[in-house]
Swiss-Prot record:
Changing residue 393 to H: In AIS6; defective enzyme secretion and activity. Pfam families: SASA. Catalyzes the removal of O-acetyl ester groups from position 9 of the free diacetylated sialate N-acetyl-9-O-acetylneuraminate (Neu5,9Ac2) in the cytosol and of the diacetylated sialate residues of sialylglycoconjugates in the lysosomes. Together with the sialate-O-acetyltransferase they regulate the balance of acetylated sialoglycoconjugates, key players in various processes such as cell-cell interactions, host-pathogen recognition, and tumor antigenicity. Its EC number is 3.1.1.53. Changing residue 62 to H: The mutant enzyme has normal activity and is normally secreted. InterPro entries: SASA, SGNH_hydro_sf, SIAE. It comes from Homo sapiens (Human). This is Sialate O-acetylesterase. GO terms for molecular function: sialate 9-O-acetylesterase activity; sialate O-acetylesterase activity. Changing residue 404 to S: In AIS6; defective enzyme secretion and activity. It is an enzyme of class 3 (hydrolase). Changing residue 212 to R: In AIS6; defective enzyme secretion and activity. Changing residue 196 to F: In AIS6; defective enzyme secretion and activity. Changing residue 89 to V: At homozygosity may predispose to autoimmunity; normal enzyme activity.
């Protein structure tokens, strides 16, 4: 995959120069095509493209013989682009979009057919987002189940790098299409993203109207490649330095994927974004991830809002997958638990004050020892997508009384005189499997601290106690599941009883050692 990106990176300036010298010609943006999904109400969908400076462009939306609306604009001289914002449309279709350029009484007409209105989601990240349906559990069954989802349309962006922000995509691996077993299972780590497809399928089952899915991902890539220079500067990310060879296998240069694979989409009206990335930062700028990730979210939101003429919500819903596990990393390595924590901006949960309107799928219990693609690529993407869609239903669609996150303590009470810590959760808890090592306390004595296991003592429906009598000093902190491989497949100790959502990892500091001291951890 690197070679094509390098080749295209070399010829790209020549291609763009040749097009511009010829006036670029009259065309839609690269991703406006037959079978596409445009964002439904309350937002207006953006239609744009390139043309001859000074020409008038009329965009017509038709359904059968009926004209639904017309919008008129002109081609901007400085960019050779034109753009219109359609009136908000109810979900449904199909429609035809026609664009006509008029200059000195000469007309050129473009048409795209079978256009639907629904919700458009962008899916991005590295290889776990890039894994195709062909690579997951029960692939044959999943690939045969496409006929019922012809209103879920898919598009996959080609892996391309660029030194500067591009206005339009250079290439598309899969143009807007109806799902088939062929385009959903097109090889390994190509197209279409399994997480993206399964997430969209769950949304369609719930919403019963069209869903558009855009996959733009590249394996082995750090967050710096997906971030604009603005957001990296805001976090004080140092200029390109050495990168551990085992952390990054794809493009790593700052902003090159933002420039070529995300920025060209920013004129599009979106419903939201789903993100699965972080493995390539476990040994690279790890300590900055609690800034670079929230900064990426903020920058993408601002850029898409501005690019779509204010049609994409300023704080559109942003979903993330918290990292799973990897057998190749030592259990003592801190990279995986650190990134999991930083994925929440060090709150342990989302949404939070630094990451508003976000939702998260915990995946640390979906480990896969026997994955032929390496344990870092677990094959159970169905559960990932299911957990993601619960968050989307709650945050993006406002569904009430829906459990979409696992239990997290809201209070920790130190009972030092009894040798206990008491944890009170804001949700009900269920002990799936007792593990006396997954909770750890930081025990300090003579200015030296070490982490010791704290075994589970008693458990009730919403609280548990931990034995801390192994600490002969001062207990200053508590952490849960702070390891690369916390448990076997769906066998972590704590889950929500009815939703089967795992308790997420956390770390909490205990600052007061008085009897009965309480520390707030979550919400």
């Amino acid at each position: 995959m690197v070679a094509p990106g390098l080749v295209l990176g070399l010829v790209l300036p020549l291609i763009l120069w040749a097009d511009r010298s010829a006036g670029i010609g009259f065309r839609f943006a690269s991703y406006i095509n037959n079978d596409m999904v445009l964002q439904k109400e309350p937002a207006g969908a953006v239609i744009w493209g390139f043309g001859t400076p000074g020409a008038t462009v009329t965009v017509t939306l038709r359904q059968g013989q009926e004209t639904i609306m017309k919008k008129v604009t002109s081609v901007k001289a400085h960019s050779d682009t034109w753009m219109v914002v359609l009136d908000p449309m109810k979900p449904g279709g199909p429609f035809e979009v026609m664009a006509q350029q008029t200059l000195e009484k000469i007309n050129f007409t473009l048409r795209v057919h079978d256009v639907l209105f629904g919700d458009v989601w962008l899916c991005s990240g590295q290889s776990n987002m890039q894994m195709t349906v062909l690579q997951i559990f029960n692939a044959t069954r999943e690939l045969s189940n496409t006929a019922a989802y012809q209103s879920v349309r898919i598009l996959s962006v080609s892996p391309i790098q660029a030194e500067q922000e591009l206005e339009d995509l250079v290439a598309v691996d899969l143009q807007w299409s109806k799902p088939t077993s062929e385009n959903l299972g097109h090889g390994y780590f190509k197209y279409m993203s399994a997480v993206c497809w399964l997430f969209g399928r769950h949304l369609y089952d719930t919403l019963q109207y069209p869903i558009g899915l855009i996959a733009s991902s590249w394996g082995g890539t750090p967050i710096e490649a997906w971030s604009s220079g603005r957001s990296l500067k805001a976090c004080g990310v140092p200029k390109q330095g050495s990168i551990p060879y085992d952390s990054v296998t794809g493009p790593s240069k700052h902003s090159v994927l933002w420039n070529a694979m995300i920025h060209p989409l920013c004129n599009m009206t979106l419903k939201g974004v789903v993100w699965y990335q972080g493995e390539s930062n476990i040994n690279y700028n790890t300590d900055l991830y609690n800034c670079t990730f929230p900064a990426l979210i903020e920058d993408w939101r601002e850029t898409f809002h501005r690019g779509s003429q204010g049609q994409t919500e300023r704080f559109f819903p942003f979903g993330l997958v918290q990292l799973s596990s990897d057998l190749s990393k030592k259990s003592s390595d801190d990279g995986f638990p650190q990134i999991r924590w930083h994925q929440t901006a060090d709150f342990g949960y989302v949404p939070n004050p630094k990451m508003p309107n976000t939702f998260m799928a915990v995946a640390m219990d979906l480990c896969d020892r026997d994955s032929p693609f390496g344990s870092i690529h677990p094959r159970d993407k169905q559960t990932v997508a299911y957990r993601l869609h619960l968050g989307a239903r709650a945050l993006a669609y406002g569904e009430k009384n829906l459990t979409f996150e696992g239990p997290l303590p809201e209070k920790i009470e130190l009972l030092a005189h009894k040798g206990l810590l008491n944890l009170t959760y804001y949700q009900q808890i269920q002990v799936q499997k007792k593990d006396n090592k997954i909770f750890e306390i930081s025990c300090c004595s003579d200015h030296r601290c070490k982490w010791l296991p704290a075994s589970m003592n008693t458990v009730s429906t919403q609280s548990l106690t931990l034995a801390i009598d192994s600490c002969h000093g001062t207990v200053v902190a508590l952490r849960y599941a702070w390891t690369t491989w916390p448990c076997e497949y769906k066998q972590c100790p704590l889950y929500h009883p009815s939703s089967a959502l795992p308790a997420p990892p956390f770390i909490a500091f205990i600052t007061d050692q008085g009897p009965g001291h309480q520390s707030n951890v979550a919400k």
